């Protein structure tokens, strides 16, 4: 099951556009206290910087919704919590805030683990609830894939 993959590792989340949805999915699983350490909802740029150590220059040059910010969020969450893995999301849930380059539903996610940080860009729909649900599911799948990849020694 889903929980079995996660329970062998300690986990943390750093969420922006998903607003704690990933953390909520972890805590809904029985036995979560054994592996889920911390969930940070860093919605503002200031909180991304102050809580997770995201470089304000990166936000200024790349935008909060960018691969680099997702990477720094995940790495920051892993660093501050000591978790084996941290998963991060930053995106545009809508209905406002989209641009031609980054339309509503654009979500960058990242997983920082013991050996590497991986990132993924997904288009998660146009409805706010749908974006949150899909981004959470994609991020959890990315996390699961990374844990399994490491377990297989790849």
Tell where the protein language model's regions lie, with residue ranges.
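Glycine-rich phosphate-binding loop
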Residues: 1
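Short alpha-helical segments enriched in small residues
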Residues: 4-154
């Amino acid at each position: 099951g889903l929980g079995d993959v996660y329970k062998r590792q300690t986990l943390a989340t750093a969420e922006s556009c998903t607003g704690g949805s990933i953390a909520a999915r972890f805590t809904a699983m029985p036995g979560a206290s054994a592996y889920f350490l911390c969930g940070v909802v860093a919605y503002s740029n200031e909180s991304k910087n102050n809580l997770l150590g995201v470089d304000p220059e990166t936000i200024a040059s790349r935008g909060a919704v960018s691969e680099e910010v997702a990477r720094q969020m995940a790495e920051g969450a892993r660093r501050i919590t000591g978790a084996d893995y941290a998963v991060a999301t930053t995106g545009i849930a809508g209905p406002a805030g989209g641009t031609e380059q980054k339309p509503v539903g654009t979500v960058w996610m990242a997983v920082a683990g013991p050996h590497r940080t991986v990132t993924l860009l997904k288009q998660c729909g146009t409805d706010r609830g749908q974006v949150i649900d899909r981004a959470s599911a994609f991020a959890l799948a990315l996390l699961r894939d990374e844990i399994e990849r490491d377990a297989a020694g790849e």
